[in-house]
UniProtKB/Swiss-Prot annotation:
Protein name from the UniProt record: Presequence translocated-associated motor subunit pam17, mitochondrial
PANTHER family: PRESEQUENCE TRANSLOCATED-ASSOCIATED MOTOR SUBUNIT PAM17, MITOCHONDRIAL (PTHR28021:SF1)
Keywords: Membrane, Mitochondrion, Mitochondrion inner membrane, Protein transport, Transit peptide, Translocation, Transmembrane, Transmembrane helix, Transport
Function summary: Component of the PAM complex, a complex required for the translocation of transit peptide-containing proteins from the inner membrane into the mitochondrial matrix in an ATP-dependent manner.
GO cellular component, one term: PAM complex, Tim23 associated import motor
Protein family per UniProt: Belongs to the PAM17 family.
Gene: pam17
UniProt region (Disordered), positions on chain: 71-101
Location(s) in or outside the cell: Mitochondrion inner membrane
Length: 267
């Protein structure tokens, strides 16, 4: 009996001691300060990788694009400001440059020839009409002279070899040659008439040149754009050849404004 009881007690003590040892081992494994330390992965301190603070390649590319866009905007603003300042300081077109140059030339010519009679616009248009008539008369006269002289020369048979080479009837060939002589005389007429007119009106020659420069500068400045013309809206006297008075010039300006109004409003 004693032996069985002692055996039972020993077994109970061993089991009790083994049951108490198991949680102690667990506590030592969980706690690194325990004397029963175990080299496990949980007990070893894990190394924490520091977060990288440098930007990625995508962020750098986006920043570079933003900087390039800002630089382009600054360049555009600078160019627009410089162009606006330069446009405010210089004339807007070549027509204005021509008008300013013509006015400066007129002032210099009038100062250089102070003793000459002053030529107003009405007198200028009258002299211009007279010169045109003289040139037209000389064109007719030179046409008659050259055509008659050419016909007389051709009738002598000087150009028979040339007439034979033309694949037409001899009468038609001679007629064409005579007409060509007449056309040459028509082209020579304005030059001859201008020379005669300048000789007769020599005191107005310098003033007329100045007035012509001013007149054509005004025509170039105020005339319309011919590219916008059409069959229903033709260009009204593009070169100002029909202007023969101050009233005619004012009517020409009204025609230019009417053309622009019709072009913009499609009336």
């Amino acid at each position: 009996m004693l032996s069985s009881t002692a055996t039972t007690m020993l077994r109970a003590g061993v089991s009790r001691s083994s049951g108490a040892l198991q949680p102690m081992l667990l506590r030592s494994a969980a706690c690194p300060c325990s004397p029963f330390s175990m080299n496990t992965k949980l007990s070893q301190p894990t190394s924490v990788r520091p977060l990288s603070t440098s930007p990625s390649a995508l962020v750098l590319r986006f920043r570079a694009q933003q900087q390039a866009q800002l630089a382009q905007q600054q360049l555009r603003r600078a160019s627009s400001s410089s162009s606006s300042s330069s446009s405010s300081t210089r004339p807007r077109s070549d027509a204005e440059l021509d008008a300013n140059a013509a006015e400066a030339a007129a002032a210099a010519q009038s100062a250089a020839h102070a003793g000459e009679p002053v030529l107003d616009w009405n007198t200028f248009f009258k002299l211009r009409k007279t010169r045109r008539r003289v040139q037209l008369a000389f064109s007719v006269i030179m046409t008659l002279i050259t055509s008659g002289a050419g016909g007389a020369v051709l009738s002598t048979g000087v150009a028979d070899a040339m007439v034979a080479q033309v694949p037409l009837e001899p009468m038609f060939a001679v007629g064409l040659m005579t007409a060509s002589f007449g056309a040459l005389g028509w082209l020579m007429g304005p030059a001859m008439g201008g020379m005669v007119f300048n000789a007769l009106k020599s005191k107005y020659r310098g003033q007329m040149e100045i007035k012509e420069g001013q007149f054509f500068a005004r025509i170039k400045k105020h005339r319309v754009d011919p590219s916008a013309s059409s069959m229903g809206n033709p260009v009204p006297d593009f070169y100002g050849e029909k202007i023969s008075s101050v009233a005619g010039y004012r009517q020409w300006l009204k025609d230019q404004r009417a053309f622009n109004k019709k072009r913009t409003t499609f009336v």
